[in-house]
Amino acid sequence: MCFCLSACGSGLSAGLEAYQSPDGRYGFFYPTGWTRIKVDGGPEIIYHDIINSNETLSLVVSDIDKDVQLEQLGSPSEVGQTLIDKVIAPEGSGRSVKLINADKRELSNHVFYDLEYELILNNQDRHELATVVVDRGSIYTFAVGTNQERWNKVEKMFTNVVESFNFLI
């Protein structure tokens, strides 16, 4: 309840809907009108825009040693580069990715690494924002992206979406 009330009161949630995990552990906002889809073996959560289907939001949750803190994995830039090398564009994938920005942010006793990428996938230029955070033996990677042509129209909203990811308990 605090998640929605604090975010709604800030005015940053215009055009966004709230999502809370079934166990109440985390929540975030996603763009109004987007649809959740399920992909076997894929991310824990995926939403996409019905009209602009290449606009997507995803949450990947992976196990990590319970004693590991995010800062132990490296700086924001190092973690961003590791994501590029191992997940987004591993060798042989044919993808080209550039890390544009990497920052550290703290919220509710958690450290978040906010990342911004430009990607070339199958001759399509994309722009993505992601945040990475560690909590209770899991590493969460929450990302939202679109094609480069729409980036300027959705940049502020996507920034609000990525920064809305938070732990509620």
Label each residue range with its predicted role.
Residues E17-P22, D103-E106:
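Short acidic-hydrophobic surface loop/beta-edge motif
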Residues G9-G11:
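Bacterial signal peptide processing site
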Residues W34, S138-I169:
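Surface-exposed amphipathic alpha-helical segments
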Residues D23-D40:
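Proline-anchored loop/turn motifs at beta-strand termini and strand-loop-strand connectors
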Residues R25, L73-Q81, Q148, N152-K156:
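Soluble non-cytosolic domains of exported or imported proteins
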